Amino acid sequence: MMKTNVAEILKSGTTLQEVIIKGWVRTFRSNRFIALNDGSTINNIQCVIDFENTPEDTLKRITTGAAIAIKGTLAESQGKGQSVEIQVSKIEILGDSNPDEYPIQPKKHSFEFLRENAHLRVRTNTFSAVMRVRSKLSFAVHKYFQDNGFNYVNTPIVTGSDAEGAGEMFRVTSFEDNKAPVTEDGKIDYSKDFFGKETNLTVSGQLEAEAYAMALGKVYTFGPTFRAENSNTTRHLAEFWMIEPEVAFMDLDGNMDLAEDFIKSVLTYVLDHCKEDLAFLDARLTQEEKTKPQLQRSDMSLLEKLKFVAENNFKRVSYTEAIDILRNSKPNKKKKFQYPINEWGADLQSEHERFLVEKHFKCPVILFDYPADIKAFYMRLNEDGKTVRAMDVLFPGIGEMVGGAQREERYDVLVAKMKAMNIDEKELWWYLDLRKFGTAVHSGFGLGFERLVQFTTGMGNIRDVIPFPRTPQNADF
């Protein structure tokens, strides 16, 4: 007798074989037909019980959400939609589910309702599909870097530096409320705190990854990061995962090559290994698009978007060229953009990025050589003195997906930039050391994993692609 899962049974199509399977009841019809799901696939398997010979007490306990164990024989299914079913010889109730209290009923629930029940929402088709895709994407990330000679580095979550220079950080302290010691000028004295200095949750592992790239050559981080940005939008989370490779002796051109190859590789992997889940999510998104006003509908289905990125060469365009294109575009001239493009130096918005990808070039785009004034201190200054070796990868439907740069490897230039941006050299003494001892050209990029999952699954809200979202005023579960 074989202990197996639903995915294996449906894939094999074998009949006349005895199996034992455990899972959760999705539906129970006519006191006879159980739709059972064990999480291995989006599909349920029909289990047909012998109503006359099943105790009434057992029948009453077969409710939506109940955990059960089934023993039976695989048979050719008489119903539509699946090749096999299980003719049940024995059923055991492993865990009851009170139908009057169980929130996830066999009907359509709003995403807002499901966020309030995040501990149970993965039992729905949509969220189980999203989380299986997330799992495969995560594996594909590690597989790509490991197959290409990268070392995985675990960078610290508690840090004393702000890699982005934005200041939107969660403070870490051991001081009790209203009992923090203060200095003579009334400020909190962090020298007496646990770490002896002011510390925060990390916003990026990039700086530490640079240190390891300057010894191991090719490294990547893949871990949680935190932003105390008070943004209640469909694109922001306070806790999310970042993918950040860093490579020694690689310039911006190599960095753009790496980003394009990486993205194509992980999307191709998911297209090959998540066909059923992506087909379901594609159909879901198609129905959702029909409810939108015509002008807001996407021209591409989910699968078309994924193949659009995975199969097209990325167009490389300088920021300056992009500004000229946008400034002379019809939407800009007719004032259709929410943020008009009037001059060089403007920080591009999602609407501009999407126009370049979806309307102008009709392929993924990599913008490079941005104005220094709108980018971080660690990006390498170009010879013109006003642009930096930064790059952003732009996707359809979402805009920026990847942000990266060739790092400033020249000690004197980096110090000057830090002073100009009022960044304390003492806080980053170790980062400056990397430019004093064996400095070299090096580059890397950052990619928010949840944003990649959101693009891959077609979910409209980033809170729906992470198991337990952390957002302003929300840290349940």
Residue ranges and their predicted role:
Residues 249-253, 272-274:
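Inter-helical turn/loop segments and adjacent helix faces that build the functional surface
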Residues 24, 140-148, 204-207, 211, ...:
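Generic, well-ordered alpha-helical scaffold segments in large soluble proteins
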Residues 163-169, 174-189, 261-393, 420-440:
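Metal-assisted phosphate- and nucleotidyl-transfer catalytic regions
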Residues 134, 252-260:
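Short, charged, low-complexity patches
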Residues 3-248:
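Class II aminoacyl-tRNA synthetase-like tRNA-binding/catalytic domains
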Residues 196, 200, 214-224, 237-251, ...:
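TRNA-recognition modules of translation machinery and tRNA-sensing kinases, especially anticodon-binding
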